[in-house]
UniProtKB/Swiss-Prot annotation:
Pfam families per record: WD40 (PF00400)
Name of the protein described by the UniProt record: Uncharacterized WD repeat-containing protein L344
Keyword Metal-binding listed: no
SUPFAM superfamilies: WD40 repeat-like
UniProt cross-references to SMART domains, sorted A to Z: WD40 (SM00320)
This protein's record includes keyword Repeat: yes
Keywords in alphabetical order: Repeat, WD repeat
High-level lineage: Viruses, Varidnaviria, Bamfordvirae, Nucleocytoviricota, Megaviricetes
InterPro entries registered for this protein in UniProt: WD40/YVTN_repeat-like_dom_sf (IPR015943), WD40_repeat_dom_sf (IPR036322), WD40_rpt (IPR001680)
Disulfide links within the chain: none
WD repeat feature ranges: 210-248, 452-491
Amino acid sequence: MDPNSIEIELSDDDRVISFHANRQNLINISEYFKILLTKFNLHDKQQIPIKVPNAFVAYDIIVELTENTESNVGNLPVWEHYLEKLKFMDYVGLSAKMIRSIDTTNIVVPKSNFESLIKLYEQLGYNSSLIPLIKNSFQKDNTNILIEPHVAKKLLNVSESKIIHAGYTRGGLHVINYCDYIDRKIIHTFDKHNDFISFLSYSKWNHDASMEQYINSIAISPNKKYIALATTCGLIIYNLIDKTHHDTIQTNQNINFVDFNYSSTNIFYRKRKWIGANGSNKVGIYNLETSKEISIGIDNLRNYHSKLSSTGTDLCILSKNLLVMCDNFNRIVVINYALDKIIKILDSCIYLKNNDNTNTVFLFPSSNKKYLGHLIVNYKKIYVQKSDTYTLFVYYIDSKRQDLQYVIEYTGSAPVHIDISNKLVVIGDCTGFFSIYKYKSGKIVFRNKIKSHNSCVTSIAISSNNKMILTAGLDGLLKLWNSKTLNLIDSYYHGCEYVDFISFTSEFGLDFDNFLRKSISNKSIQ
């Protein structure tokens, strides 16, 4: 018998495979076999037992490396055979380049095995053969799988126009790309001292050209193509795809409200007169296709009030050509602006026991433009105090239905920003706390309140799958929370006063919710 011939016994949890191989050929394969066959008192044995993850695949690889012959003794599907081979190569410390590469461009991994594919990628690091395999196998309903940043960057070659976070400061507007957001990099800044300086120098502005220009609010079109800035000098529109200036609307008034319609064709904005003057009932409409602007007058559009929050609005645009406003009687008026017709008037105050000393704080539309929060304060003095009580009425509003869903009684520090989804309501207040309410079938089934920032929560938002909450504060921190456990997932310093949590879909159907960094808290969202 050949002294170099040994019997290898490969075993896993289900099977045992025995075969003869040349000892020296095995030693030449890798350091793993060299150590195995020259140490541990195995150098003089003729039968070597080896425990492996998959005996069939281990046999195939040994045959391929020692005899230069392809083998698939277990008759596994191509995708499974290839992945198992990669696992074994990693198990014994071999380079994946040693095995025959296969064309994975047309191979699809079943949905039930997709998560194991992602875990293998994260385990092995970058592998060019796995990239097309992941792209081909991803399905839009794989929403519970969290993909690490390095995977996301290799998977998606998406331009900077794909936005996850937009924010503004007194110094300018910041736009963060979703992939670079994960690495905490601001990839483009529209700075007032650069991009904005041309607008400040226009002689047509009806104010001192040296006057500081502030951004009051921002809105991003549903198709993610445009961003509109409501400023103290007028309305500025950027094309986010080309990163170019689209247009500037010059006004004689401060603009505090801006929003897009559902089809991303029109921009609505509210003009405001200077302090001490009554609010204007004029609403401007700018058409992005024609670059033309008109103003419409709305009867009983409420005058601006000193108690209005700085982050809400008393005018908003919902889906299906609906404009919703708060009138001088604190009622919600639902208008089909395409038909120039009032379709519903909702009076929240009729539900209050004492509405003599109440006032609307603001309206807060949901990101899907189907829900509307109407926040009313019952105050004891002319100025809002910590002892004031608030009532939030949440309505479902479309062209056919205008229904009150539920009511939230809120007592405590003044609310600053509210976001609403189909399952959650979150309220950020002026002392750095945020409250979360979960509802089902019109009833609040869970509520909690936690400290999120050292000072005012300037903005708060809910992710599209209701699994995450994003908060921003005057402390300059942007924080991401697990809405189920209320654990902090991640945080970083951004310096923005306002954040907008935007969900988008790339050409591969991957949503941002799949790209959370898990390294900070090591907590995944179930």
